[in-house]
């Protein structure tokens, strides 16, 4: 059974039909590359998979569970938060906080998640002392995981640096670490090699292949064909909101 199954996703924005019945599946630990020219609908697709937006029609099934069905009631805020954790997104612009260190950029999303867990813990009539201890335990786990990720991504010596002190490739790795710390089931990249020179593109290829060895399931949006075929297990080509080609690599 496929790990991810996307069925008949449609999306209209204004008077424009952006996605016109997109369907595909993906096995666990594999890399899917969505290839297409600018305006083909690639970024709209990834936003709908990550629930930054919602399909007008279609279903999304992940790890044997339907996580979105356009026929169902709208997702509650709690359900939406849970969905965001399932599919991590590495933005094209990285979206790092300039006033936070590398370590803080990685831990911030998990810290917000930890505070939500403490709220739930509090509702079980736990004392303030118990709440404090629980939060401290969660924080230690988060810090340990952040340091582990930074080490795996070759950033252990950059933990106290700020984004402006990093190269573009290093900023991208920080963005990846920030997504991975929430333990997503799928990691999505939006144009990870856009405007990079060949040397940096080679670094991205190496990094994605390393993540694949760790059994991460990934979806990559790109318009660069050479890059696509260096990392993909499966490629789908989108044109004007439709899949015009699909093949294993």
Regions found by a protein language model. Give the residues of each.
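Helix-to-loop junction immediately C-terminal to a conserved catalytic motif
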Residues: 50
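Conserved ABC ATPase signature
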Residues: 162-166, 170
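A short, proline-enriched helix->beta-strand linker immediately N-terminal to the Walker B motif
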Residues: 181-185
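Catalytic Walker B motif of ABC-type/P-loop ATPase nucleotide-binding domains
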Residues: 187-190
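Helix N-cap at the start of a conserved alpha-helix in ABC-type nucleotide-binding domains
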Residues: 198-200
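H-loop/switch region of ABC-family ATPase nucleotide-binding domains
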Residues: 222-223
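A short, surface-exposed alpha-helical micro-motif characterized by mixed small hydrophobic
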Residues: 228-230
